[in-house]
């Protein structure tokens, strides 16, 4: 399986992130290419969010410095529909707007995409570990931060509540993000749901291992295995990680 993210062409960002829902977006084109080449041999998951496409870098419609939750939901639904139309097997909303799973599920069903699954970022924390990805995707907020809609790192009860809500709204899989500093959250959510549970071994976690290995401070293969085993032991059924290709090619797993 692969999880696809996209960025618009230079100068194409706008206040509402409209390039994200274009049928000719980078993500839609990548989905079509992968499906034409590999068909059902690969599960294609697509990220559904606005932050890489908005001129302000926030994950929703911004007005007077505040993200407007309900006005964002139709935009997220449109992104999911564009990805489903391109052939995505699963859409993965990462925005953390309230009610987005229900809005996306309703939109998919009404468009006859009942078989397209939803992997919900149920517990996405306002973490400093996202830094390298935000630099690469040029999605750092131009003003403020995302603490108003992403979760407080000190709060595990909210993760359980969000997992229950997303399951009730129609999510097929749930996710905890990041992974290594949140193994207790993975365990807590695992004990509350029978849905498949994913975790995201994010860019900062990956970069820390790579940087330490480059300096000879640790054995990369052993540490990668240990980290992935820890996530699995905590209860993750699926792991999204930047280590995957190298780990497979080098036989680390």
Q: Residue locations for each model-derived region?
A:
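Alpha/beta enzyme core
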Residues: 1-253
